[in-house]
């Protein structure tokens, strides 16, 4: 039994080390270069007659991602809005894919008095996405799909699902004067508004903010709105 567990562990390490090309029908292991990875994936896919490749997104550390930050800590330095996705555009950047999500604000529940990191530079969108209209903002997110040499390359962040159209979101934002924004703690500050105005996280975690939303507000938009009005 011990030898079997050792063998399974060794296999798992090997898979992580070599990288993965994932297609609709097979998973093939290859040595992935550190530079020009997206072009390499496209070339390998074409050589194998594939038209689509799926790869994992890199790990990202987000401002506000510390699990001990409470909901009230986040409210003290964030803008809280209800918004919906208007458009999205994916771009290849530094051997990874970034998707710029354009949101329209439906309601502002709370405006931040100051940014948690005044010296942090705001996200810089591609010129093609400018100008940003009043009442809209742009959020960059790792992952998305781009086409390189006729091959669709999809990068997936399993801990931070893609934003969806026809879905209302409650967002905890670091909103900059430029009209760009980041969500507090990445996926931690993103909630879907579902039936009966319930607010549910896009990705379940043990983060204190999500626990507070459940225990203090009962995942209720109405209860949250009342709490924010008296701040």
Feature locations, PLM:
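Transition segments tied to proteolytic processing and entry into folded domains
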Residues: 2-231
